[in-house]
């Protein structure tokens, strides 16, 4: 397990990277940190804070229902996990925290924030994850922030920090610096827009062939279901945080939205789906499977919902993935503790209806974050059943490879636990380009043309949220 001293290099595996530290294979005892919380007199939204901090290193934001609601904004991390680190073990490299004399209710304090890309499946299931890499982003990005700005569910802003003696003076300076930057910002504005996100005729045709081939695999008994995806592409030269700012200004942010600026590029995840939420020994997942267009007209929206709820195809997709998620979580939970209701809940999202089921369990004693994530990664709702064989089928059939898309995005905190989304509806940004992956579950009675249209239905609200559109050639 990779472990580090807070603020102190443990050996020569440290190097300076863009103002942060990069961790290699250092092993050291993690000291106890002290929680510091200070309420701030701000009444603004996270879009204003993001615009004020636009020049800061490794700026990131989680917005929606993360850690109980509100938002968190962080920048200037203490260190960044290097390419040789174990990304799963890194999620456990957290300090013990002394909260004596501090109201810690709802606090995050700090921790690891970032993403785990889909290609990390190779480290978990030992199967090849093939396909081209159009977006030149790392397989994972995890940065340790010992301080952040937290907006709670009631709209109050807090400066939160995990203080160790070597960092006490520096963190006081950081608070004053952030006060000055945000205090001078009047209101957040929308950032630059990408060009329209295009689906080329060639990619669309390959997707149709992939869906048809997947149905043949199902008919042959190789798999029951696989999630087959494609990518749209556009031009964009701004930052990820600016793109999320646009979505926030337009009020089109789902439950598990996130943005990360890194030297290699960035991501904007407008995901509605919870992969894992762990607090103590309780763990929860919210797999989504079953989607329908939700028209603006209320009567047509109700009709669309009724059709979704009565769809045998969507019900079959959903039941299989819920069972898969129960099995994955059950690998690290106490026997008999995993529970899911018999019927899914229909949730309304921008332009869409989704069927969602909450799966819950109680982890076995001493279960680490790494063990939990490894047991469930990559998310079942974006792979298929049986999972390992579905991974192989996906690698063989999909027209483009996956990177951050369909992995997971979120945080690991010593106070707030672990929370990761499923990185769907996620834009990957690098080199002046923007890529959006979309797809859907393929089962025995899937229709290739209908599956292609469902992918575009999912893409359009994401494009609208960031001020652009979708063009299918």
Predicted regions and their residues:
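Extended alpha-helical targeting/anchoring segments
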Residues: 2-473
């Amino acid at each position: 397990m990779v472990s580090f001293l807070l603020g102190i290099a443990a050996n020569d595996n440290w190097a300076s990277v863009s103002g942060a530290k990069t961790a290699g294979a250092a092993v050291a005892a993690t000291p106890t940190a002290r929680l510091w919380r200070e309420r701030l007199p701000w009444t603004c939204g996270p879009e204003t804070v993001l615009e004020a901090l636009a020049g800061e290193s490794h700026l990131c934001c989680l917005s929606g229902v993360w850690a109980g609601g509100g938002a968190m904004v962080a920048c200037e991390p203490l260190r960044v996990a290097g390419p040789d680190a174990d990304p799963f073990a890194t999620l456990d490299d957290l300090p013990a925290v002394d909260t004596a004399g501090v109201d810690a209710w709802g606090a995050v304090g700090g921790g690891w924030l970032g993403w785990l890309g889909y290609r990390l499946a190779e480290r978990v299931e030992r199967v090849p994850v093939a396909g081209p890499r159009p977006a030149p982003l790392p397989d994972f990005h995890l940065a340790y922030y010992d301080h952040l700005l937290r907006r709670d569910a009631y709209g109050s802003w807090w400066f939160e920090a995990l203080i160790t003696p070597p960092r006490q003076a520096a963190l006081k300076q950081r608070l004053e610096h952030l006060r000055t930057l945000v205090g001078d910002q009047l209101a957040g504005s929308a950032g630059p827009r990408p060009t329209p996100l295009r689906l080329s005729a060639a990619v669309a045709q390959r997707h149709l062939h992939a869906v048809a081939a997947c149905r043949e695999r199902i008919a042959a008994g190789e798999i029951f279901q696989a999630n087959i995806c494609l990518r749209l592409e556009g031009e964009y030269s701004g930052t990820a945080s600016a793109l999320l700012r646009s979505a926030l200004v337009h009020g089109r942010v789902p439950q598990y939205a996130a943005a990360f600026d890194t030297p290699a590029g960035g991501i904007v995840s407008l995901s509605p789906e919870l992969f894992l939420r762990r607090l103590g020994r309780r763990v929860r997942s919210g797999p989504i499977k079953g989607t329908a267009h939700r028209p603006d007209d209320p009567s047509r929206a109700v009709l669309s919902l009724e059709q979704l709820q009565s769809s045998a195809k969507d019900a079959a997709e959903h039941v299989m993935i819920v069972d898969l998620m129960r099995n994955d979580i059950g690998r690290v939970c106490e026997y008999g503790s995993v529970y899911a209701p018999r019927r899914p809940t229909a949730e309304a999202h921008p332009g869409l209806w989704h069927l969602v089921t909450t799966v819950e369990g109680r982890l076995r004693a001493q279960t680490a974050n790494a063990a939990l994530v490894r047991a469930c990664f990559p998310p079942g709702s974006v792979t298929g059943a049986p999972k390992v064989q579905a991974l192989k089928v996906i690698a063989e059939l999909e027209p483009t490879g996956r990177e951050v898309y369909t992995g997971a995005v979120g945080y690991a905190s010593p106070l707030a636990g672990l929370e990761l989304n499923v990185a769907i509806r996620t834009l990957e940004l690098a080199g002046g380009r923007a890529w959006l992956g979309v797809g859907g579950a393929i089962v025995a009675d899937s229709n290739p043309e209908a599956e292609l249209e469902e992918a575009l239905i999912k893409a359009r609200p994401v494009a609208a949220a960031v001020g652009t559109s979708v063009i299918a050639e």
